[in-house]
Amino acid sequence: ILLRIHFTFMTALFVLLYKMINPKGITAVKLDGYLDPLFFSSDSLSLFKRLKHKVFFRTLRQVDLLTVETQCLYDRLYKEFIDVYDIKLKLVLMPNGFDEETLKTLSIVEKDFGHKENIMITAGRLGTYQKNTEMLLNALDLMELRDWKVYLIGSISEDLDFFLKDFFMRNPSKKESVFFVGPIYDKKSLWEFYNRAKVFILTSRFEGYPLVLTEAKRFRNYIVSTELDASEDLLENGKYGCLIAQENYKELALFCQKIINGEICIDVYENYDKEDIS
């Protein structure tokens, strides 16, 4: 069996080569939210890109199983290719799950909402273009945190250093409420942050199917996220959180301030079944 993550050009070459060597072998590709744009466009392309386009479609014939994580991408693929390459027979909607087996080994005592703290967290590679940490910091500029604390978990890019210094120069009092804790590699220590927190914030410009959202939902965090396919699925039409327009830090600040002020109910997991993402 050949399993590849992401349907890239390299994946296409691996699949074709594998099928040449082992025609009866099984090939599977987990998209992880990513599909090369050349799948959906062949007009006005250079000769090299047109060749890549043909390679992708030849590969689509050879793939035996194609898993997608979000309903949006599943629908797009199904609609685009329903009449070709037996796509409906090989396309499977398979969202990322949560590792319950690891959780059982860590002796984490899960907190219900009444025992959680007034904490908002985010996690990821802080300062990268994808994660758009600046959007969160710009929102924090406008917020009165009161008795709430915000923890930013993850490695910090060099590009973010200047932005951080400027942020704390403008907001010296927030040194007592906004914390950069660095990357946490120990799973128990990381999950304890989710366990303590009431709110998880994600400001990414784009994502595949981020595991941080699955973890946030598993630990019953109210999720405030930019508009992403995975967020739309996990929030279930706003039941477990709110979607914020891309780049709109003012909207993010206003919504989070309403949470802090107690104007929005974030205790939304009363009837939630953890098996839904396990």
Residue ranges of model-derived segments:
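Membrane-proximal helix-turn-helix segments that form the acceptor-binding/catalytic region
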Residues: 20-21, 47-66
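A short, active-site helix/loop in glycosyltransferases that binds the activated sugar's phosphate group
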Residues: 57-89, 98-100
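Conserved donor-binding/catalytic core segment of Leloir-type glycosyltransferases
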Residues: 112-131, 137-140, 151
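Nucleotide-activated donor-binding/catalytic signature segment of Leloir-type glycosyltransferases, i.e.
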Residues: 163-184
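Short alpha-helical donor nucleotide-sugar binding micro-motif in glycosyltransferases
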Residues: 183, 192-197
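Aromatic "clamp/platform" in nucleotide-sugar-dependent glycosyltransferases that forms part
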Residues: 205
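Short hydrophobic beta-strand element within catalytic cores of glycosyltransferases
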Residues: 213, 222-225
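Conserved acidic donor-binding segment of nucleotide-sugar-dependent glycosyltransferases
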Residues: 237-238, 242-249, 258-263
